Amino acid sequence: MSTKTNVVEVLNKQVANWNVLYVKLHNYHWYVTGPHFFTLHEKFEEFYNEAGTYIDELAERILALEGKPLATMKEYLATSSVNEGTSKESAEEMVQTLVNDYSALIQELKEGMEVAGEAGDATSADMLLAIHTTLEQHVWMLSAFLK
């Protein structure tokens, strides 16, 4: 049976993931080059703004559950399943990496929804579902870009 502690762990994993993605998306926004520069530069900015919103919402939910959100880069990097960007990726590699990262997060969010549901925490489950829904659309659009 899942508990509030399990839900906080799930949410903190996502706080870590989104903080690493926030930095990675800035990296991509600054270092993207090539014929798709204008499109991707703008899209990466949209994505990092979205990431910032998720970070705040997830951290505040953890606080509402009387937990402690992760709050240092060291903690984020140790906990995240997302890797940092290198500043050396091509535009296509950046997009493919985001497809991979978002796909991995979709799976983690599904698992997190189950944990929250078992703990009777419909609010956290709903929050994770909303992020999941958005990421499925992002994966579809980014994958279409790569074709």
Curated annotation (Swiss-Prot):
GO MF, one annotated term: ferric iron binding
Q: Which residues bind Fe cation 1?
A: 29, 56, 60
* InterPro entries to which the protein is assigned, alphabetical: DPS_DNA-bd, DPS_DNA-bd_CS, Ferritin-like, Ferritin-like_SF, Ferritin_DPS_dom
Q: Which domain of life is it from?
A: Bacteria
* Binding annotation for Fe cation 2: 60
Question: What general EC class does the enzyme of this chain belong to?
Answer: oxidoreductase
Which PROSITE patterns does the record match to this protein? Answer: DPS_1
The name this protein carries in UniProt is DNA protection during starvation protein 1
Lineage, top ranks: Bacteria, Bacillati, Bacillota, Bacilli, Bacillales
